[in-house]
Amino acid sequence: MSNEEINIHEAEEQLSEQEMLRRQKLVELQEAGKDPFDVYKVERTHSSADVKDNFEELEGKEVKVAGRLMSKRGQGKVVFADLADLPGKIQLFIKIDNVGEEALKEFKTFDLGDWVAATGEVFKTKMGEVSIKVTSFELICKSLKPLPEKWHGLKDPDLRYRQREVDIITNPEVKDTFIKRSQIVKAIREFLDNRGFLEVDTPILSPIAGGAAARPFITHHNALDIDMYLRIATELYLKRLIVAGFEKVYEMGKNFRNEGVSVRHNPEFTAIELYEAYADYNDMMEIMENMIAYVCEKVNGSTKVTYEGTEIDFTPPWRRITMVDAVKEFAGIDFNEIKSDEEAQAIAKEKNLEFPKPLDKVTKGEVLNMLFEEYGEDKLIQPTFLVDYPVEISPLTKKKRGNEMFTERFEGFVYGREVCNAYSELNDPIVQRERFEQQAREREYGDDEAYMLDEEFMSALETGMPPTGGLGIGIDRMIMFLTDSSSIRDVILFPTMKPQK
């Protein structure tokens, strides 16, 4: 026996009784000249929704539908079956008088999960259900693996994410979530396009991981013999386009961060960044709150949504609060009274705050930010802009007018979670280089999420970038709120998973 024959034999031994039976049925179909995998195209005339929505017009007329067989009922001379397609389900009525004895017998051998095309007359049953009185049918794909029985969606979350296609087949709510995701993305693009923004594409592979404080994925380009990074943000390339003279640009796409997995984080995620020349962070607040309101109205019909039992009101304007005021409100510490790094370090020690570098190297602004994260972040339930971040943690941002300890930066929070980040963009190349050099020192202290110096970006900035506002939004997190999904994995079709052994 050859190795190939041994492998086939071992694979067959691992098949369940149901799978073996289905494969036997396939062989019988093929021997009878009815191989379902020889079907190349189906001339469907209507979807299930078309038939139901236009019943009065279609009653008594012939239609052809196609979909997955989800249930069969009845024996004898009549069989009822449910056929599922993307919009929903349609009931088939298969009677011996309409299809013949042999055809009815053949239909009874079909398994749940098989794909079927059926032609027949539209009518209503005595129970008032819109159905199709089948006159002919064809098996167009044989399902060799049975669907789990008595499902209302997978119970094991790990299996749901690994077998998303089966999850969608058996759980209409999951399918609806991803249809809504597509509608949300479309509405975001529509809003920006209507405001004159130009959608662009920038590299996913780059020699520098720039534009955000995050740990990157590293890969190797064989032909160039250099290490490259999967992008952690689109920021620096998009700013170079502002330098080039494009006044309003945006990009929606995948970013990658080599960090932990949680209900809020997936290493591969969808984000949008937009940049507008001659604008500042106040303009970005206006864009953010009005864009989300537009999307909510477009997709849900209201600016109010319910998330995990709490009503979230996205109606503009959102609340604005400075980081200093938030720390005073939620941690009871007035940073207007803190005059030195040493005073801030003493507070950090008292509060047991942890940093990625020695405490004596930590600045007042870094302590302020950490206090907000520890005491204030989870308190911002309704949509809120947290404004004016310390300069130490905002290396790509202009200093605040009137207070150079802070920057014109905000982050948007909903239900205690960050959903966006925006700046009045730093366009002074001399100051920008100084900020990057400080970030390089942070990396020396052990902060592997500190920004890298990008000389190509610096060259562009030296060419001249006008005053610019920039905004970045985590699409997956916004979709979580608009679909009432508790985990980011519930809104990503195929989330990152550890391979099964």
From Swiss-Prot:
GO terms for cellular component: cytosol. GO terms for molecular function: ATP binding; catalytic activity, acting on a protein; lysine-tRNA ligase activity; magnesium ion binding; transferase activity; tRNA binding. It catalyses: tRNA(Lys) + L-lysine + ATP = L-lysyl-tRNA(Lys) + AMP + diphosphate. It is found in: Cytoplasm. Its cofactor is Mg(2+). Keywords: Aminoacyl-tRNA synthetase, ATP-binding, Cytoplasm, Ligase, Magnesium, Metal-binding, Nucleotide-binding, Protein biosynthesis. Its main location: cytoplasm. Its EC number is 6.1.1.6. InterPro entries: Aa-tRNA-synt_II, aa-tRNA-synth_II, aa-tRNA-synth_II/BPL/LPL, Lys-tRNA-ligase_II, Lys-tRNA-ligase_II_N, Lys-tRNA-synth_II_C, NA-bd_OB-fold, NA-bd_OB_tRNA. Binds 3 Mg(2+) ions per subunit. It is an enzyme of class 6 (ligase). Pfam families: tRNA-synt_2, tRNA_anti-codon. The keyword Glycosyltransferase does not apply. Mg(2+) 1 binds at E411, E418. GO terms for biological process: lysyl-tRNA aminoacylation. Belongs to the class-II aminoacyl-tRNA synthetase family. PANTHER family: LYSINE--TRNA LIGASE, CHLOROPLASTIC_MITOCHONDRIAL, LYSYL-TRNA SYNTHETASE. This is Lysine--tRNA ligase. The lineage of its organism: Bacteria, Bacillati, Bacillota, Clostridia, Eubacteriales. The gene is lysS.
